[in-house]
């Protein structure tokens, strides 16, 4: 039978595994299953058809799309489908399918037909036999040929799979059939039983009956060579199995491989375990079973098949390794000479715990036991009954202990019996015989299982077979003595007739086996009441002779030298005792050796008594820790019997460490290809309370934001692909699985998808995974799903979601996903692979969802099974679907494998519209837009159920997308960021998703639905800008209408807006191109663009917001030549683009959204602000408002975002007075810009006036966002320059001015460092600054300047960068900045300039980079990490101030100047008033923030005054717009007030979500605090922590740096919502710069104020945190330890990383660095972009830097980027400002977009900032541009992830 089994089972498996390789038996002649013709016959045909079909496929593609995709798709498909070698993804997918498809359904097209006669009969009976091991006589039944099954080969195979061979062969005949009970978690017995009853190879097969088996057969491969058959079975250990090595480390058995080699002569098997350290196991500990021992049990028969592998496992949580001192077990060898007074000795034993007995205590033996018997105390508990005289037991049952009832008569005997310890075993006569041998009985008790002692329940463990004869000890059973009885499984009591002990001596370990012979109790003539039931003694059935007797073995380790006689006895008994699988003489470390046959009880009980049990002596020599191994017992072990074998493994004490925290994630497999997007699973370390761990399931799964829409939030059961060696420990708080599923960790902070949409959607999404949604959608239409099967859905380029589902009920129920996993692979390849299966039904089904949501089913002709499966052979529609499956389409494409009634594999290919439900991630809008663009017409958008009312966002997106190549637009936009890109497309044309977003956005932003939509659509960053824009527009137009009905009107509006935006985008594109060409005259260019934007804004008042958002995208395309460079910045600094046209502004938000919550919170606030400002601004945007909006946007986007950090103030002012301030700002729209510039610049002062609407943010930004803001300002500038290059030039001018202003402040501050380079920058910056900056910023600046000194470098660098950007925009500044960039930028400029691009693309990163500049500049000042703080504050503030201020002042100035000097002056006055207000607020905030430092900073930058003029000049263009803006501002103020309330409510929600996220990240946050966010950073970081976990730990060393880093992270993460992000980051940085208290207090106050006004601010920190959490989580191990690079820990380290990672991960790294090294990282990122600068910075820290890369592909749905998200985890050892060495681990998520795809627009957008930098620093430009593109893209993408 064993042979049969082995052969039978493998054969099917073999068929499955090697159906194509091995000769298959003739398939059943199923009518519906024709045999596939040989593939060869079709190969040529297929080859020919492949080309033709591909051509045909392309003919079906829209000409425009075809034009764009022809080459790419051809190459992609050819590459994907053409490569002969299966890729890792293919292998994984196919293996996954193989493993999850029913084992017997795989490759078995030749299954015997149902009509095929089946030999032999009752399969059920036979299977039952197998199950029960009751094959008494079947041992030799047809050993060689498979046992005929009742018909079902499957059943027979199942039998084999589920039964040990020896059971099958009837080896178990002597075993008594037992009813197996399911192993309860923690139930050692159950587990042991499990292993005992099942061979390992069977364990994996998961038959329905044996679900609990630890091993799951994943694959079985049979090789037949000659007569040698080698079967390799690969088992997936589910639940997790673990092996403990000699050191005590527990290793997960990732896979158990059983190699069976059978030949005529030999049949051998060996187990290979693929293990990995348990601490690397990211599995629920309750699922972990420790394989306590593997033993090969060889039957006596020569037949090898008699051997069985016994895996003894124990639930991990049940393992309580207790180091027991040997003294506890020391035998008291010569305790009492076997001599004279047995009774006295008996009393001794009775009164003392054995372990307390010493040989010298004979005299005092009668003394009461020294120690109290404490329950649970091992020593005292061990011998519980020893402590009482036996007589005390008389007539009463001792409940908790051995349940022993002394016989009424013979009690005296017992007491006299020296074996009082053994009362249970012998009766008085026995006592007399053994009179002097106390030790024997002592040993007996020592060997009693503790629970037998401790529990009164009768649990004899085996069913005793009675054996005739007296026990080997020859002790007669005394009837008068208490009768000890064993209870068998049937509950029968068997009196112990004799007890014998056999000693096994091996090594220095002595084992005793107690053999109890029993006699049925009823034969004792005594009532059971007098019986002590012995529990937990191993029964050895002696088959020989009378089966009626069973020997009970107590196997124990002698208390050392327990009596020679006993040893002899033992040796004697050895022959009789059942042979243990383990050698009787165990080598010292041999786990198998000592077999404690103590009965074990369920782990839950074990926990209580483990102490006692463990106390059993282990080998005296080394085993201090006892590993209890449950030795498998024969299956016959009755279920009821609790008898367990505890195997004590001797492990030298010290060696074994059991870490209970076994939840660790293994990094997503970095398969070298961007499959990094697979879900990260986080398991938190959980202290496992004893006994309850198994109940707890902590699984965290972060889904990339990109995958959010389709990825199931809940943990994927599937194991992480083998081969992923790196493990990360995720220090996420765990929460119950249920809550996880319910709310995806509520805030979704842990879910990367979080950024995608507000928490509400996220929570919903977590409840239904994409696969579930797909299945639900498919199942909703009858006829599609008819059977459980496997769902394969393309999640994105190179990634597949594989889900195994079953249909509940009769197939009518909803599909239930049993297992879902993301694997890397290409759907087309997998489909081709699947199609090659011989059992594929040729009649497939193609399910296509039309835009209306109707599923259209078409028959799908599948290639003949035997054919090559080339694409040409496929149905053209399937080909098209496959092409989409490559990730180029937004549609959800996939394949469903189901089984037909005939047993064939029915394939259903489906292409579903992106889900537009709230659950869908923003991507769906993008997808919709993308699909519309793919089709070349936007009509599909009309079909959306909701339409944004005149949603400009969609238009801009459309126009942006359309202005770009359709592909470019699509590709371009989505790659921006999973969030941003999605937001872009969404905002622009992918409004479908926005509805959800709107749903959230509306509440969040409290903006019109359109804004909401935009928010959703641009939710990432775009959402922010879009929402802001839309909110602004929506508010302006009709916030009410938009919020109420973001749905339909928005979409229509979006469509119209898209068209308008397309036209505008095209015109803008031309303008931008011209402007870019005009680069030297950016102002002119900017004017046209701004004018165009203004017009567009005026034209698309509504559209503009979207447009603003979109323009960023479109702008990028428009300004592709130059703006693309700039635009990427613009995108991140969307607000700049917003200036350009709200478009760019929105993308900033897009980046923010990655913060998810941040976006929402920030966005709401931003939106409020923006609604106030933006609403005001949108109008200004249309005219002067163009710039005003730009500023407003910038203000909202930048300053507003700046306000976010300080929003409490700024927003407080802005919120309460925000409308007024907004109006004022709008009124002073030019000033608004100016003010914004001023505000940010003089974050303390100007921000207030400007931030009357968003004063605090500027303050914080001024301080915190100094670096950020330069990033932001640069971003704004860049955005303006890039996003609205045409516009940008003016904006840039205006921004340049702000930058100049800021730079003057920052420059002056920074000038000392960057003087040579900075002066020029200063000048450009100065002009914008004076008007407002001088007024407002200087005060603020001054406060910041002190912190800024470090900040100077950053700020200067940033200002320089801004200048550089300005210079880029403004040729003159560009020159200087270039110089500066070249010179200082390497440190400051590069960071700033780079940061700019980064900030805009990964502006956050860049902003942090400026911080790095600060850090670098601060490197010089590196000694003062506090300065970094200051830097962060200040650079942030200056940058922020100058950036936004500069931009805004520029814009404001532009607007103002263009409007009129008077208007400008008036605006300035208003601004001044606002500034005064802001200053007042700022002072409050500044009280926390170093206002004086800012002031000093500003004062230090005397040139700030100079900036103002420039700003006015810049403002000139928007004169009329500004006035318009004012009028609109007034109106918008009202709308804003409304929106404010809405937003407030939304923000509260967001805040709540953020709080959840923060709480989720609380574990991280404390680290962040501990890490050295000593000041506020920890707090901010806590919020930022999630967003920038790295940030949190990144700047433990320097809060300033950290702030910078956070800023960087924020900025980068918020590249989309850079402004917001910057605002937040800056606020945070600012706050941090001020001091966490400032951040906390002002932020909190502001937040609360904002909350009152715009709730978001508070959320903002969370938001910051939140964004980082969802998309990517960087876990930072920030351990303060002296590091090599104490000086510039963050920056150098960051720089190095940046340098190293810059090219591919530059932005992400920037982000990461920003996050971690806030400052340093930003700089590095900047450096990344400009590696030259970074390396210097990096060089110091490299040595302390560790980098581990976790690659996540976050853009599953964004066809724009095939790139994967690369998560780089870097560890930096940095020295913080306080000299603490901080080990920072930063995880940078780099989204690598496919540069080839949309290098211009996509990369351009992202790279634009870099380009800007490069423009600033040409030297680095060309070389870094590519980096910049990739890096920036990565940044932008990763930023959302980071956030």
From Swiss-Prot:
Modified residues annotated as Phosphoserine in this record: 205, 208, 213, 295, 332
Entry GO CC: adherens junction; desmosome
Domain of life of the organism encoding this protein: Eukaryota
Segments of this protein annotated with the region Interaction with CTNNB1: 531-632
Biased composition (Basic and acidic residues): 564-577, 1357-1368
Disordered, as annotated region: 1-48, 132-151, 406-432, 455-479, 564-591, 943-999, 1063-1205, 1238-1277, 1289-1471, 1561-1696
Location in or out of the cell: Cell junction, Adherens junction; Cell junction, Desmosome
Name of protein: Xin actin-binding repeat-containing protein 1
The encoding gene: XIRP1
């Amino acid at each position: 039978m064993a042979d049969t089994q082995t052969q039978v089972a493998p054969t099917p498996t073999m068929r499955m595994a090697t159906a194509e390789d091995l000769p298959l038996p003739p398939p059943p002649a199923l009518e519906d299953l024709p045999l596939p013709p040989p593939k060869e016959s079709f190969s040529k045909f297929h080859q020919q058809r492949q080309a033709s079909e591909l051509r045909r496929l392309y003919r079906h593609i829209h000409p425009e799309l075809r034009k764009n995709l022809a080459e790419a798709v051809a190459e992609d498909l050819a590459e994907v489908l053409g490569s002969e070698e299966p890729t890792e993804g293919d292998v994984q997918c196919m293996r996954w399918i193989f493993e999850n498809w029913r084992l017997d359904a795989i490759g078995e097209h030749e299954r015997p037909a149902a009509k095929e006669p089946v030999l032999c009969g009752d399969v059920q009976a036979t299977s039952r036999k197998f199950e029960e091991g009751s094959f008494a006589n079947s041992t030799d039944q047809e050993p060689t040929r498979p046992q005929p099954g009742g018909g079902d080969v499957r059943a027979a195979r199942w039998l084999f799979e589920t039964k040990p061979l020896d059971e099958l062969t009837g080896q178990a005949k002597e075993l008594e059939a037992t009813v197996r009970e399911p192993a309860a978690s923690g139930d050692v017995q159950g587990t042991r039983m499990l292993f005992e009853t099942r061979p390992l190879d069977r364990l994996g097969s998961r038959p329905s009956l044996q679900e609990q088996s630890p091993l799951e057969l994943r694959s079985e491969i049979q090789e037949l060579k000659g007569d040698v058959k080698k079967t390799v079975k690969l088992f997936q250990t589910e639940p997790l199995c673990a092996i403990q090595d000699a050191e005590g480390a527990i290793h997960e058995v990732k896979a158990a491989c059983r190699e069976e080699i059978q030949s005529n002569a030999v049949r051998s098997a060996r187990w290979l375990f693929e293990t990995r350290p348990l601490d690397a196991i990211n599995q629920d500990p309750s699922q972990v079973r420790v394989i306590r021992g593997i033993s090969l049990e060889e039957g006596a028969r020569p037949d090898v098949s008699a051997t069985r592998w016994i895996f003894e496992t124990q639930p991990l949580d049940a393992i309580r390794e207790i180091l027991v001192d040997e003294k506890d077990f020391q035998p008291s060898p010569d305790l009492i000479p076997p001599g004279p007074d047995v009774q006295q000795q008996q009393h001794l034993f009775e009164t003392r715990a054995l372990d307390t007995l010493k040989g010298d205590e004979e005299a005092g033996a009668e003394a009461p036991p020294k120690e109290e018997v404490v329950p649970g105390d091992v020593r005292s508990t061990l011998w519980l009954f020893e402590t009482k005289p036996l007589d005390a037991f008389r007539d009463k049952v001792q409940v908790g202990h051995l349940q022993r009832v002394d016989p009424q008569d013979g009690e005296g005997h017992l007491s006299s019996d020296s074996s009082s310890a053994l009362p249970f075993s012998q009766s008085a006569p026995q006592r007399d015989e053994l009179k002097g041998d106390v030790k024997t009985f002592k040993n007996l008790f020592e060997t009693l299982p503790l629970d037998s002692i401790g529990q009164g329940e009768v649990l004899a463990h085996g069913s005793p077979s009675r054996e005739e004869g007296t026990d080997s000890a020859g002790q007669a059973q005394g009837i008068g003595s208490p009768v000890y009885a064993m209870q068998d499984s049937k509950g029968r009591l068997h009196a112990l007739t004799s007890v014998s002990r056999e000693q096994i001596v091996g090594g220095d370990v002595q084992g005793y086996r107690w053999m109890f012979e029993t006699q049925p109790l009823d034969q004792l003539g005594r009532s059971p009441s007098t019986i002590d039931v012995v529990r937990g003694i191993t029964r050895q059935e002696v088959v020989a002779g009378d089966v009626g007797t069973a020997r009970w073995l107590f196997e124990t380790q002698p208390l050392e030298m327990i009596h020679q006689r006993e040893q002899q006895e033992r040796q004697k008994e050895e022959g009789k005792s059942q042979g243990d699988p383990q050698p009787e003489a165990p080598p010292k470390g041999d786990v198998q050796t000592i077999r404690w046959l103590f009965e074990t009880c369920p782990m839950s009980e074990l926990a209580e008594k483990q102490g006692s049990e463990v106390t059993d002596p282990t080998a005296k020599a080394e085993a201090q820790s006892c590993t209890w191994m449950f030795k498998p017992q024969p299956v016959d072990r009755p279920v009821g019997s609790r008898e367990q074998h505890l195997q004590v493994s001797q492990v030298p004490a010290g060696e074994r460490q059991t870490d209970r925290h076994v939840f660790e994630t293994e990094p997503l497999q970095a398969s070298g290809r961007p499959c990094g997007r697979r879900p990260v699973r986080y398991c938190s370390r959980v202290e496992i309370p004893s006994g309850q761990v198994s109940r707890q399931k902590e699984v965290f799964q972060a889904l990339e934001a990109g995958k959010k829409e389709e990825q199931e939030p809940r943990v994927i059961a599937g194991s992480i692909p083998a081969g992923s060696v790196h493990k990360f420990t995720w220090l996420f708080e765990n929460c119950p699985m249920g809550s996880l599923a319910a709310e995806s960790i509520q805030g979704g902070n842990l879910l990367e998808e979080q950024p995608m949409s507000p928490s509400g959607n996220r929570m919903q999404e977590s409840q239904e995974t994409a696969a579930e949604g797909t299945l639900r959608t498919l199942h909703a239409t009858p006829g599609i799903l008819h059977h459980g099967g496997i769902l394969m859905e393309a999640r994105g380029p190179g990634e597949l979601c594989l889900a195994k589902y079953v249909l509940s009920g009769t197939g009518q129920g909803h599909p239930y996903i049993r297992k879902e996993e993301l694997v890397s692979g290409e759907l087309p390849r997998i489909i081709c692979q699947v199609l090659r299966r011989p059992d594929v039904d040729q009649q497939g089904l193609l399910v296509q969802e039309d835009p209306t949501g109707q599923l259209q089913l078409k028959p799908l002709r599948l290639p003949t099974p035997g054919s090559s499966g080339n694409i040409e052979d496929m149905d053209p529609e399937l080909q098209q679907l496959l092409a989409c499956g490559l990730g180029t389409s937004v549609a959800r494409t996939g394949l469903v494998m189901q089984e037909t009634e005939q047993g064939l594999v029915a394939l259903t290919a489906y292409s579903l519209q992106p889900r537009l439900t709230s659950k869908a991630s923003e991507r769906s809008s993008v997808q919709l837009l993308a699909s519309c663009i793919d089709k070349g017409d936007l009509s599909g958008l009309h079909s959306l159920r909701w339409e944004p009312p005149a949603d400009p966002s969609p238009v801009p997106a459309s126009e942006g997308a359309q202005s770009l190549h359709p592909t470019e637009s699509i590709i371009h936009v989505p790659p921006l960021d999973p969030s941003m890109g999605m937001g872009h497309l969404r905002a622009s044309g992918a409004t479908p998703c926005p509805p959800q977003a709107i749903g959230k956005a509306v509440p969040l932003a409290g903006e019109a639905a359109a804004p909401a939509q935009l928010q959703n659509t641009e939710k990432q960053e775009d959402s922010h800008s879009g929402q802001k824009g839309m909110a602004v527009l929506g508010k302006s137009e009709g916030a009410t209408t938009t919020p109420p009905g973001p749905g339909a009107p928005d979409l229509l509006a979006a469509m119209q807006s898209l068209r308008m935006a397309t036209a505008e985008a095209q015109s803008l594109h031309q303008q931008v191109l011209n402007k870019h060409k005009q680069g030297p005259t950016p102002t002119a260019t900017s004017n046209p663009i701004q004018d165009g934007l203004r017009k567009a804004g005026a034209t698309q008042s509504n559209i503009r917001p979207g447009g603003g958002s979109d323009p960023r995208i479109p702008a990028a395309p428009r300004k592709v030549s130059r703006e693309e460079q700039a635009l990427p910045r613009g995108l991140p600094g969307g607000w700049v683009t917003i200036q350009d046209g709200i478009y760019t502004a929105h993308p900033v938000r897009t980046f923010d959204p990655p913060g998810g919550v941040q976006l929402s919170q920030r966005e709401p606030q931003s939106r409020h602000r923006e609604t106030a400002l933006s609403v005001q601004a949108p109008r200004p945007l249309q005219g002067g408002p163009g710039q005003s909006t730009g500023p407003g946007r910038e203000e909202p986007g930048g300053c507003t975002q700046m306000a976010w950090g300080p929003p409490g103030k700024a927003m407080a002012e802005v919120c309460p007075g925000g409308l007024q301030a907004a109006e004022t700002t709008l009124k002073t729209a030019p000033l608004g810009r100016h003010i914004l510039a001023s505000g940010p610049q003089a974050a303390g002062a100007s921000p207030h006036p400007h931030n009357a609407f968003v004063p605090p943010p500027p303050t914080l930004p001024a301080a915190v966002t100094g670096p950020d803001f330069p990033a932001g300002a640069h971003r704004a500038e860049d955005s303006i320059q890039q996003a609205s290059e045409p516009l940008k030039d003016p904006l840039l001018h205006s921004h340049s001015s702000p930058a100049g202003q800021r730079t003057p402040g920052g420059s002056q501050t920074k000038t000392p460092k960057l003087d040579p380079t900075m002066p020029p920058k200063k000048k450009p910056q100065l002009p914008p600054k004076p008007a407002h900056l001088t007024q407002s910023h200087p005060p603020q600046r001054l406060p910041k300047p002190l912190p800024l000194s470090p900040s100077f470098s950053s700020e200067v660098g940033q200002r320089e960068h801004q200048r550089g950007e300005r210079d880029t925009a403004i040729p003159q500044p560009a020159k200087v900045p270039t110089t500066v960039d070249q010179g200082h930028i390497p440190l400051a400029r590069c960071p700033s300039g780079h940061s700019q691009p980064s900030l805009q693309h990964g502006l956050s990163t860049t902003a942090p980079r400026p911080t790095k500049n600060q850090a670098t500049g601060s490197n010089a000042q590196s000694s003062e990490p506090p300065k970094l703080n200051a830097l962060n504050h200040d650079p942030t503030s200056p940058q922020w101030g100058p950036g936004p201020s500069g931009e805004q002042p520029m814009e404001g100035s532009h607007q103002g100047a263009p409007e009129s000097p008077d208007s400008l002056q008036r605006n300035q006055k208003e601004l001044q008033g606002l500034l005064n207000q802001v200053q007042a607020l700022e002072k409050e905030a500044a009280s926390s923030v170093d206002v004086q430092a800012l002031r000093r900073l500003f004062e230090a930058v005397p040139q700030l005054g100079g900036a103002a003029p420039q700003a006015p000049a810049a403002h000139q263009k928007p004169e009329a717009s500004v006035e318009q803006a004012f009028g609109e501002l007034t109106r918008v103020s009202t709308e804003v007030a409304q929106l404010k309330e809405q937003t407030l409510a939304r923000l509260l929600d967001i805040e709540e979500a953020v709080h959840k996220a923060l709480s989720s990240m609380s574990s991280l946050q404390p680290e962040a605090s501990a890490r050295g966010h000593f000041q506020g950073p920890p707090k901010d970081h806590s919020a930022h922590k999630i967003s920038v976990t790295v940030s949190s730990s990144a700047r433990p060393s320097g809060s300033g740096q950290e702030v910078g880093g956070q800023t960087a992270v924020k900025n980068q993460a918020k590249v989309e919502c850079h402004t917001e992000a910057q605002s937040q980051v800056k606020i945070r940085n600012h706050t941090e710069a001020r001091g966490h208290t400032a951040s906390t207090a002002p932020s909190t106050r502001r937040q609360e104020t904002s909350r009152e006004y715009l709730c978001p601010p508070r959320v903002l920190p969370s938001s910051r945190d939140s964004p980082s959490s969802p998309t990517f989580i960087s876990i930072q191990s920030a351990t303060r330890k002296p590091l090599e690079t104490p000086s510039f820990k963050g920056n150098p380290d960051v720089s190095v990383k940046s340098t190293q990672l810059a090219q591919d991960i530059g932005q992400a790294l920037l982000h990461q660095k920003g996050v971690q090294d806030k400052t340093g990282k930003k700089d590095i990122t900047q450096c990344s972009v400009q590696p030259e600068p970074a390396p210097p910075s990096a060089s110091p820290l490299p040595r302390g830097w560790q980098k581990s890369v976790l690659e996540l592909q976050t853009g599953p749905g964004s066809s724009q980027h095939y790139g994967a998200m690369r998560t780089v985890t870097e560890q930096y050892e940095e020295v913080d400002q306080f000299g603490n060495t901080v080990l920072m681990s930063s995880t940078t998520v780099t989204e690598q977009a496919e540069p080839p795809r949309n290098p211009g627009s996509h990369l351009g957008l992202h790279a634009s900032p870099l380009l800007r930098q490069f423009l600033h620093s040409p030297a680095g430009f060309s070389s870094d541009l590519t980096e910049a593109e990739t890096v920036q893209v990565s940044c932008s993408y990763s930023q959302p992830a980071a956030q």
